[in-house]
Structure formats: structure tokens, C-alpha cells
Amino acid sequence: MSAPNDNPLCTLANGQPSENPGSVQQVRYGNSNGGLIVLSDTQTLEVLAHFARERIPERSVHAKAAGAFGEFEVLEDVSDLTDANFLTGIGKKTKILTRLSTVGGEKGSSDTVRDVRGWATKFYTEEGIQDFVFNDLPVFFIRDPIKFPSMNRSHKRHPQTNVPDNTMFWDFHNGSYVYVKWHFRPDEGIKTMDADTAVRLAGLEPDYHVKDLFKAIEKGDFPSWGVYIQVMKPEEIKNAPIDIFDDTYTWPFEKYPLRLVGRLTLNKNFSKPECLATQTRIVTGILSILVEKQPANKSSVGPNYFQLPPNRPTNKVYAPYVRDGPGTMNGNYGGDPDYVFSELRPVSVSHRVQMPTHEVWAGHVTAFSTSIMDKDFEQPRKLWKIICEEKGGKEQFLHNILPTLVDIPGKLRNEVLDYFGRVDGKLKEVLREALEKQSKQAHNGK
């Protein structure tokens, strides 16, 4: 059956032709416009039921995002470090999908708010999906993973007032292998936006960065990033100047220089970034931490999120013990046994050897919460010196941070100033004097 003039025939989801997609079956009385809807009105029930379920629940963090397809190309040989297929062979290209986001804001928030930026990339390798998740900061906010939920809540709206709260922000406290730290550096360089421009755009163009990415790709101006790694051998850990497992530190570049791996380019727009499940899969040759992301993806996208096209591997998948549940798209493996080591359906396995040479740990299991030490302020002190050496850097820093300190309780403000004092004693006094000056100006203005 086809519609006149080759226009698509309007149907219900089951294919049943619709005479009028805007009509409602109802009990009519007289000439009024109202009536009682009948339960036999399949079309109305379908439309309303779908509307209430058509959106994927908003993510707890990184809710506002844009996405794009692209490719990763190997530029330098790193086969001495890994046997991961997608990283070996100069010129080898791998399809990728990237999601770029803010962190704290909800889905309707502005792109230009002062916030960390998230970066999630999915590599469609010949050996399966490889996920990477990064932030644009060289360090992470916290050491202890149990503090992760609280840290993110402190960046969100106050549960009582439902508005962002600076008090919450400041109140929260051959089988062999090597360790690497990844760096994605934009080929166009790093460009920042001053606070006044960001505030103005937040009102005039809240989707500023989403539109900028879409338009750039649409006109062929593809953004690209150089992909680098820092490398540390297991035997170097003992004498390393930092704890390499502490994400609040950077690795010294003079001791662990950047090594070029390849280039990542975004060249095709993607309209469904919420379908993208992040940091859920790794391939042989790469080790990573996946604890937090898998449950989050199962909750928001669904238990079979890995079967959605954006999350589906390009190589053949056979995992018959992962079946059933909402959103199954793979035929559910038919009558194959749903348990391992079945003689009814023998399978072959990979024989790539992983030698845990360095994976022998000596110690006692104990409940532990990290404390702040003087060593923790060494890298921030170096960063503060760099800021002071830049033209206008010190002034811009004060302009950005002072508004967040004005309206918080005095005791908490003094604690924050004490922390800045441990970075640099002069910085503490500069902040205190600036706050006192603002307080006097506000008092005189009343």
C-alpha cells in the first residue's frame, strides 16, 4: 500500500495505516469540542505512552554534550609498548566516536559556564570496542573514589534552593606492560574565553560550543587533536617523584616526555550523543578502570546498551551468556546454550598471554582516607608562578575566583584562604585584601 504522489504513508508503530494522525476516538455529545477518550483508541494510547518514555534519563554528570564521528590515525610506531592492534602500524586508521561535554550542568545548561570539560572517545577496533574517558584538566579533583558522588553533587544545585551554591563547591574535601598517561592536544592550540564573554554568551547563545562543532564539521573544517603518551616502566615506580596512581598529580614532563602516537580527527556529525555509553570496554593490550561507568550506562541507556549502533563493536561478537533483557537487537543467540564450556556449542578462545610480572602487591587491606600533605601543594605552587608570569594572568585569576568566595560563610572562607596560603603566602594575602575591598565597596554602596 502506498500514499498518493509517492508521499510516505503515515502509520502506527506496528505498521497499521493511520487515517488521521491528529484525531482522537471519543464519546461525543452534542456540538461541544470535548469528549471522553475510549480505550480502544490505539493511536492516542501509543502516542501518549511513547511520549512518556521517549527520553533517555539525564546523566548524573556530563549531561550537556555534543558528539561527532571521526578517525584515529597512527603516526608513530609504539609496538614496543603495546600489542593493541589499533595502535600498531603507521598509517593505520580506526573509526571513532567522540562525545564532548561539560561536567556539572544539566542537559539544558549553557556551554560557556565555568566548568571542566569532559571527553569520551570510542574506538571501533578490529579487536572490539576501546573506550577512553578524559577531562580537560591534567589532574583529577580527588584521590579517593568513594568521594566521587559527593564531589559531583557539590558542583550541582543546592537541594533546598535548587540554585548553584558556592558554599557547596568550597565545602567539599610479551605480556609485559608499561604505565602510560594519555594526552589529547588540539592542533589549533588552546584557546580560552574570559568570564565576561562566557556570561554574555550563556544568555545569548547557550549552545555556543555545540553549534560551533556542528558547523565546523558541516563545512569541512574538521577539528583534530594530536594524541600523545607519557611512559613509565614498572621498575621506575619505586623511585618516581610522585605517586603515579594519584590522579591529583601530573607526571613531570622533563622526566617523562610526551611521545607522539597519532592524530584524532572529527569529520562527521552525530545526532544522538545520549546513546553513547562511555568508558565501558577495553581491548587486549590496554588496562583501565571501569567500575563506575558500566552501572551508570546500564541504568541510563539500558542493560543492552552495548547493542545500540554507537556502542556496537565492528568485529563479530559471540557472548551467549549476555542475553535477554530490554533492547535486545542481536537475535538473542537463538538456541545456543547460555552457559560457558558447553559441548553442544564448542567455542574457540584467544591465546594471547598476559604475564602479570609486576602485578604482585604486598600490603594489608585496611580502611583508609587520604590526608592533605605539604607535598600536595608543590605542583599548584609551580602553576601559580606560571600564572603570575603571564601577562594579566594574576588579575584574571582573581577576577574569576573572587565571586565564588564573597557569599560563603566566614569560617569556610578562612579555610579556603588557608589552603591558598599553603600554595603561596602572598596569594592568601592578595585574596584577603581583595575580599575586604569588595566588602567595603558593597557596604558603602548600600
Which ranges hold each PLM region?
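Active-site-adjacent core segments of small-molecule enzymes
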Residues: 1-446
